[in-house]
């Protein structure tokens, strides 16, 4: 799962 705060993986 994408980690919030880390680009380019951003949770909107």
UniProtKB/Swiss-Prot annotation:
Tissues expressing the protein: Expressed by the skin glands.
TM segment ranges: none
Molecular function in Gene Ontology: toxin activity
Gene Ontology CC annotation, any one: extracellular region
GO terms (BP aspect): blood vessel diameter maintenance; defense response; vasodilation
Subcellular localization, as worded in the UniProt entry: Secreted
Keyword vocabulary terms for this entry: Amphibian defense peptide, G-protein coupled receptor impairing toxin, Secreted, Toxin, Vasoactive, Vasodilator
Family, as annotated: Belongs to the bradykinin-related peptide family.
Role description: Induces relaxation of mouse trachea that has been precontracted with methacholine. May induce relaxation of arterial smooth muscle. May target bradykinin receptors (BDKRB).
Protein name as annotated: Bradykinin-like peptide AV-12
């Amino acid at each position: 799962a994408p980690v919030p705060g880390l680009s380019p993986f951003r949770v909107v």
